C-alpha cells in the first residue's frame, strides 16, 4: 500500500506543484491590477523608491506571465527562477523593515509574508524537477563498432 501511495504521489507531484504555484501567482497577479494599494503600502514602508502603481502593475504582469509558463510547462527552469526572485524580493521586507513584519514575533503582515518562504521552496522544486535539456552538441555521439 505504501509503495502504491508513493508511486501515485510521484506521478502527480510535479504537475500538482506547478499548477498550484501557477494558481497562486495568477491570483495575486490579478489582485495587483484590481487594487495595487496594499502592495504600494508595503513598498512605501520598505522600499519607498518602488512604491508606485506602475511598479505594482509590472509585478502583477510578471506573476501572470510566470503563471502561464508554469501551467503550460514552457521554460520551467526560467519560470521557477523568476518565481524564486519574486518571493525572495518579498522576503527582503523582513530584513529591510522588521518593524513592518514584527520579526521575530510576527505581525499579521509578517505572517502573511512568511508563506513566501514555502512558495519559494516550491519554485526551487519546479527548477529541480524540470527536464534537463542538453544542447545537441553536448550529447555523447554513438561510436560505430566494426564487427569482425
Task: Tell where the protein language model's regions lie, with residue ranges.
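Membrane-interface extramembranous regions
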Residues: 1-148
Amino acid at each position: 500500500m505504501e509503495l502504491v501511495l508513493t508511486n501515485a504521489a510521484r506521478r502527480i507531484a510535479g504537475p500538482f506543484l506547478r499548477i498550484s504555484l501557477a494558481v497562486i501567482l495568477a491570483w495575486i497577479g490579478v489582485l495587483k491590477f484590481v487594487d495595487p494599494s496594499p502592495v504600494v503600502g508595503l513598498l512605501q514602508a520598505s522600499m519607498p523608491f518602488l512604491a508606485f502603481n506602475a511598479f505594482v502593475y509590472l509585478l502583477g504582469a510578471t506573476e501572470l506571465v510566470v503563471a502561464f509558463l508554469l501551467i503550460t510547462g514552457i521554460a520551467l527552469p526560467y519560470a521557477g527562477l523568476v518565481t524564486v526572485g519574486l518571493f525572495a524580493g518579498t522576503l527582503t521586507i523582513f530584513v529591510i523593515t522588521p518593524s513592518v513584519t514584527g520579526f521575530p514575533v510576527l505581525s499579521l503582515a509578517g505572517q502573511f509574508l512568511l508563506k513566501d518562504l514555502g512558495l519559494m521552496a516550491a519554485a526551487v522544486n519546479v527548477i529541480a524537477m524540470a527536464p534537463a535539456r542538453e544542447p545537441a552538441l553536448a550529447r555523447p555521439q554513438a561510436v560505430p563498432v566494426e564487427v569482425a
